[in-house]
């Protein structure tokens, strides 16, 4: 997945590019698919993977959610724009689980952690107040061959929904949620060969989440504008320089 958030507060989602060898991150500021600027962001420690970005301390600036696979420790890196201003340990995950995303699932305006257990394909949400655990709930078990690719409110009912991607068939599916409970599903568009679905956010500001696509072999990005699960149109975005990726880890 890609790390997407509005880092400069202009109402448009931005995304984070990562240098695979140096672990430097850069925030790419966007207006829909158009690059309007960029800024150096923190270099990631060798033991930590960048998983997501959300405003954990409610200072209106998105923060980094980090995960150490070897220790199962989570860390929040507090940012002001692209600048690191502090950090705090989050929960240590149970054995066999990994942090895969962040989103507000219970509507309390505090971002939560989405965790995944590969051996059973179970997902769960860990409800947070900043870096402190206040509860947890099971999310849907993912079918074999499908992976979580994005979180957004696709049907406009308030609660977050999940979008899954099947890398073999290129098919996408939106799972509609009420809190943590699955209440329905709909097929989304099928992607072209060599492209991956890496995030969902409302890039064109029409009130409907869109797909962020990435092609690893050419490092191209594209945005597919959607109305719920229905494809509307597409635009190409930035092609990343050699050695950089939009994938979080």
List each language-model region with its residue ranges.
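Trp/Gly-enriched beta-strand/coil motifs that build multi-repeat beta-propeller-like domains
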Residues: 1-249
């Amino acid at each position: 997945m890609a790390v997407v958030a509005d880092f400069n507060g202009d109402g448009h989602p931005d995304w984070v590019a990562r240098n695979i060898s140096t672990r430097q991150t850069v925030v790419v500021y966007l207006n829909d698919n158009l690059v309007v600027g960029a800024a150096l962001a923190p270099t990631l420690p060798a033991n930590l993977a960048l998983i997501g970005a959300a405003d954990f301390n409610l200072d209106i600036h998105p923060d980094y959610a980090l995960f150490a696979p070897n220790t199962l420790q989570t860390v929040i890196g507090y940012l002001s724009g692209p600048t690191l201003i502090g950090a705090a340990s989050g929960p240590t995950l149970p054995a066999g689980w990994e942090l895969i995303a962040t989103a507000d699932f219970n509507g309390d305006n505090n971002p939560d952690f989405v965790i995944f257990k590969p051996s059973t394909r179970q997902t769960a949400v860990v409800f947070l107040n900043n870096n402190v655990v206040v509860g947890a709930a099971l999310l849907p078990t993912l079918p074999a061959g499908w992976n979580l690719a994005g979180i957004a409110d696709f049907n406009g009912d308030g609660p977050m929904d999940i979008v899954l991607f099947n890398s073999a068939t290129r098919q996408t599916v939106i799972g509609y949620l009420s809190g943590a409970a699955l209440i329905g599903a709909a097929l989304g568009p099928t992607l072209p060969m060599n492209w991956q679905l890496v995030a969902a956010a409302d890039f064109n500001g029409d009130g409907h989440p869109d797909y962020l696509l990435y092609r690893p072999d050419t490092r191209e990005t594209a945005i597919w504008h959607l109305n719920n699960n229905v494809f509307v149109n597409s635009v190409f975005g930035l092609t990343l320089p050699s050695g950089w990726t939009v994938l979080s880890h």
